[in-house]
Each structure stands twice: as C-alpha cells, then as structure tokens.
C-alpha cells in the first residue's frame, strides 16, 4: 500500500510507528523560507546587482516574495522526500504563500503578502475552534504525534492554540498597517517565532498533566 500524502489521524496506531524528521532538520525546513524572506528583503538591491534577473520581480519586497515562494516549495518537496507525507500546517501555509505571493508579484502590491499571516492564522484558529464546536480536537494533526494526551488535554490545548492563532492574526494586522515594510518583515521573522516558542513552552504544564505516556509509566510502576 502506498503511504498517505497527508499526515495520518492522530488516533491511527500506524502513525506512532512512523519515523519523524530529525527535529533540527524539521526546524530548518520550517524556518528556512522565513530566513530567506528576511535576507532577500534586507539585501534586495545587492541581490539584484549580483543576479540581474531578480530585478524582474521589482523592489526588495517583491524579490523577497519570489524567493520566499521558491524556498517554501523546496521545503515542502524536501519534507515529502524525507517522510512521504506533507505536514498539515506547512502545506496549508504553503498554499496561501503561493496564492498571495502570486498576487503580490502580478499586481506589484505588497499588501497581499503582508495579509498572508493574517489569513493563515485566522484559518488555523477558526479550524481548531470550529473543530471543538463539533466535538473534534484537531491539534493532533498539527503536532504530528510528538506526544499523546488524553481527550481533556487535547481539548484544552486545542482551545488555547486556537485563541493563540487568532491573537497572531490580530498582531500581524496591527504591525503591517502601522509600521514600515522593513519593520513588518523583521517582526514576522524575529518577533513571531520567539512569541510562539514562549507560548509553546508555557503549555508544558498542561501537556505533562494530561500525558498518556506519563500515566502509562505510572501505572506500570504501580503494578510492579
């Protein structure tokens, strides 16, 4: 049987047997396109001097957008080659990057690439909270079986991440509408990631309280 293109359901026992990507490599694949975007925007004129063909894109933000799209495609292809699956979040984000990036380049209007984080985070937040409304905790797809939680743990974590994504959408709107393009790019790369890491670490107490692995380990010790 051919492997699934998308990630398996978190409750699928076969998913637990799947070898994940090396965490460092996974981080590189996720952060790589953002770093390319930041560098290309900061050194856009230099890049055009070295590679005149990039001048066809327009100013630095448009050069950065074109290279961001290319880097995103490479990251998704690399993920597929390494795991034979496409992680849900990077895949959805990639689709939005291609659509809004294409609009940015075609119309020569950077408003589209600036709105991309708003659209993606609103979509993720809406899907997670909407799933809870219908009794489904969908965050297991996002975390790719990094850990196993009980039902209550997944509900709480899904709710918190849903609100966090909506918060990121609002923050992006505030920043791009009130600050320069360079400031927005810098915040997108060096602001959003630290905020996300801090939020992630702040959820560890909840994860530990509801971890099925810890409960199984405790029961195993009690049985000895």
UniProtKB/Swiss-Prot annotation:
<dbReference type="Pfam" id="PF04279">
    <property type="entry name" value="IspA"/>
</dbReference>
<feature type="transmembrane region" description="Helical">
    <location>
        <begin position="187"/>
        <end position="207"/>
    </location>
</feature>
<keyword id="KW-1003">Cell membrane</keyword>
<keyword id="KW-0472">Membrane</keyword>
<feature type="transmembrane region" description="Helical">
    <location>
        <begin position="123"/>
        <end position="143"/>
    </location>
</feature>
<keyword id="KW-1133">Transmembrane helix</keyword>
<dbReference type="InterPro" id="IPR006008">
    <property type="entry name" value="YciB"/>
</dbReference>
<feature type="transmembrane region" description="Helical">
    <location>
        <begin position="20"/>
        <end position="40"/>
    </location>
</feature>
<feature type="transmembrane region" description="Helical">
    <location>
        <begin position="156"/>
        <end position="176"/>
    </location>
</feature>
<comment type="similarity">
    <text>Belongs to the YciB family.</text>
</comment>
<keyword id="KW-0812">Transmembrane</keyword>
<feature type="transmembrane region" description="Helical">
    <location>
        <begin position="61"/>
        <end position="81"/>
    </location>
</feature>
<keyword id="KW-0997">Cell inner membrane</keyword>
<protein>
    <recommendedName>
        <fullName>Inner membrane-spanning protein YciB</fullName>
    </recommendedName>
</protein>
<comment type="function">
    <text>Plays a role in cell envelope biogenesis, maintenance of cell envelope integrity and membrane homeostasis.</text>
</comment>
<feature type="transmembrane region" description="Helical">
    <location>
        <begin position="86"/>
        <end position="106"/>
    </location>
</feature>
<dbReference type="GO" id="GO:0005886">
    <property type="term" value="C:plasma membrane"/>
</dbReference>
